[in-house]
Amino acid sequence: MNRLWTGTEDNPFADRTVLIAVQPLWVEPFVKTFLEEGGHPLSVHKAEEVFPILQFEQPEFFILSEGFDQDGSQSNPLLGYIQNMPMNQRREIFAVWVSANIKTGDLLSAFSCSVNLVLQSEGLSEMSKQIKKSWSQWKDLYQVFLQTRLQVSGR
């Protein structure tokens, strides 16, 4: 079972790798929050930096945003990567999409973006609280599935 499913119930970030691929303006608040929570933030500035990392390590959290390493007319290449992941891999990560145009916690927007949570960029001060709440709900949903899969297949 992935490390994302182990650890303390109240702190999903403790000893977990968090890949941060957001607009430069938003990097600092995320890095600061995850360091304070005991996580291991890994911020990247260009999409080309991410794919070599993903060959050797699968971060437990992906924090992505519109406008990352693009001119605005293109979609985020990392979001495309997550959307095309095999489902057994996708279930092992928690993806957050940051946008100025989407309301924080909008489930339909999260579903349409294939992420676990959407955050509005104006509400980044509450990001830790929002991510913890959403992660807890997500873990409650998938934990039964993963426990059953482990019992049936042994992996």
Give the residues covered by each predicted segment.
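Alpha4 helix (beta4-alpha4-beta5 surface) of REC/receiver domains from two-component response regulators
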Residues: 99-117
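Structural motif
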Residues: 20-25, 45, 64-68, 98-100
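Short, structured coil segments at secondary-structure junctions
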Residues: 37, 57, 112-115
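Non-catalytic signal-transmission and effector/linker regions of two-component phosphorelay proteins
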Residues: 1-33, 133-155
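C-terminal output helix
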Residues: 123-131
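Acidic, metal-coordinating helix/loop segments flanking the phosphotransfer/catalytic sites
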Residues: 45-61
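A short, hydrophobic beta-strand element within the central beta-sheet of small alpha/beta folds
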Residues: 89-102
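Conserved phosphotransfer microenvironments
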Residues: 60-86
